[in-house]
Amino acid sequence: VLNQRDELILREKYPFVGHTTRIPIALPDRGTSIQQTTELTRKKPTCLFLGSYFAPNNQGILWFVEHVLPYVDIHMKIVGRGMSKLKDESPALRDIEVVSDAPDLLPHLQDADIVVLPIFSGSGMKVKTCESLMYGKNIIGTPEAFEGYDIDYSLVGGNCKTAQDFIECIKNFTQNPRPRFNEYARKTYLQKYSLDAIKQSFKTIL
């Protein structure tokens, strides 16, 4: 299973299941392509939401735009397959930069000061969280976005349960700039969520 939550669900549905092992999500390393800049986050940070046109993503970003965006001074950017459709459907996104079906995500990740992940539903572990770690990004997300990840939220960015949490976390970045390249995030990916790391986990159970 990917995480403790999945294990509990599995045992609830199939009480006869014996021993289980948690093996988290892993991705091949593409993070070497990003520039490991020493620049600090900008006073008006670019906050990037990565996600395709999909109900949990749509719900999350629309919530963020309504409950967080009016109270912070940021440049908001939404990048994801089919997200132009959401912009057409949602007047709230009218003045927000939306890039749909981008051929390459790297320039958008490179430019972002912070990746925001306001995700409230789903299962397993979120791929975009792993990708953001891989590219060494500052990440501000919900408990659902971080479900199953073993990380220090204060070092990676912030774990936000409410709109006010998001607002305060973003304002902390604007008042106390951090490196745009988050070495802790990158290191966490390499040690725990890279293919090499997961291979070691499999070796321990075989």
Language-model features, listed with the residues they occupy:
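Conserved catalytic-core segment of nucleotide-activated headgroup transferases in glycan assembly
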Residues: 12, 21-111
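Short Ser/Thr-rich beta->loop micro-motif in glycosyltransferases that lines
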Residues: 100, 117-123, 144
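Short hydrophobic beta-strand element within catalytic cores of glycosyltransferases
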Residues: 114, 128-134, 138-142
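Conserved acidic donor-binding loop of glycosyltransferase catalytic domains
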Residues: 125, 141-143, 161
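Short acidic/histidine- and often glycine-rich active-site loop of Leloir-type glycosyltransferases
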Residues: 143-159
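Conserved acidic donor-binding segment of nucleotide-sugar-dependent glycosyltransferases
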Residues: 154-164, 171-178
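A charged, aromatic-enriched C-terminal amphipathic alpha-helix characteristic of glycosyltransferases
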Residues: 177-206
